[in-house]
């Protein structure tokens, strides 16, 4: 990638985020890498520490993005670690005001606070015997490789898994039923990771419990799937794959068609 300027630039551009998307990625990061490991180890959640961790990550990523360190020779996401970030305004020479940054931080703090206060999330997370955050689920359908990455999968000894998808949106107007249905389908049909419980095989996609958590509004939304929903997911995958094929027909490179991500 580093030897091909066009591919390198495409890599840069693929990592750029808006301020609004960035605040959500920080919330994802803190929940996935700070909160979930503590819950798996049955440690108490200390709100003040979590906010401090989030603030430090906010500052580290802001500095990384401000100086466009993603463009340093040899810089990779792995090398940068959790400080890795790239923001549109910095890359395009646009202004980010203190008001913009203050609002972004306020939203991050509010989202994390609401997460800790939402019993619809915290109670099942404490009841689960194993939590898996941001794990890729791969399966094949209709000659396509499908990849889904749920925010969180909660496994229980005697209950079907719960998939939690959190959003950091000021106005929760969109319905994410299809996205969650894709996750449920992927969980059941994927090649299980080594740490997934053997009991997963006893469940069907329609058994999976689904929770969408709007972290800025503190509103939970539950979804129950039917066989018709699962048929709709598979039809959606087929249609999406066909549209991608039509979009890239002018380019014969097969790697453009290798994977669909949801």
Where are these regions (language model features)?
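Metal-dependent nuclease catalytic regions and adjoining charged, substrate-binding loops involved
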Residues: 142, 172, 189-262
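Short amphipathic alpha-helical segments and their helix-coil junctions
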Residues: 1-14, 159-164, 241-249
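Non-catalytic protein-protein interaction segments used by genome-maintenance enzymes to assemble
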Residues: 129-190
